[in-house]
Amino acid sequence: MKSEEKSTNKEKQTLIIRKYHQYLKLEKALSPNTVDAYQTDLQKLLHFLEGEGIAILDTTLDDLQHFASGLHDIGIHPRSQARILSGIKSFFHFLVMADYLEGDPSELLEGPKIGFKLPEVLTVEEIDRIISAIDLGTNEGQRNRAILETLYSCGLRVSELCNLKISDLYFDEGFIKVEGKGSKQRLVPISSRAIKEIRNWFVDRNGGWKIKKDFEDYVFLARWGKNISRIMVFHLIKELAKKAGITKNISPHTFRHSFACLLYTSPSPRDMRRSR
């Protein structure tokens, strides 16, 4: 009898998790990467509850506080703790909203106290050094220069850069069309320097790059003919920063932060000038 009840609870939990996944994806319109992160963090709680013999719908505030204490005890960074607990609060909010629970046991759950950390940014001189570290003698050299100029002058998220299409480019008007989070579209100004580097890249792209079917409209391609990936851009920037002697811990998002900072001194991305 107990095993049948346990099996029923497991099936119900699986159904709830599936509906929560749909809620994050369709109603909240979160990106696939964000949905995966929420699900991964939720699995940590589910594993804990299973070990304690607690059904998800029987969870109390005490249970959640016990779980939160465990995150601290095993040395998880406070920022990661805060992210995990934020995702869990989102899950219990969904359970109440979907009428699985009458009250939210996570409502009074508190995360760790963390200070505000300013994001790492690059100076104009450091950006010049990184871009100058690109070897234009390689097949990917001009593409890489166009990638970094576009990231910097447009302040794009790396996913937006990877999915940029030729049909999204409006060079005569000085804009590109970008599809951001939640499939929301926006027009973004692009610098004349970035336009020049993309056009130079198109000369190489059209002069011998093999392009896979259905990927002809993507601006930035990998060697195997499909659009570049987020991991590729991450490794590219890490490699160039090391080559340029930049010791800051940077990523593609660092270019977005640097773009935002430069906007304080330049009224428009098209007014941004560098010495190179």
Regions found by a protein language model. Name each.
Residues 1-266, 273:
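Conserved catalytic core of the tyrosine transesterase superfamily
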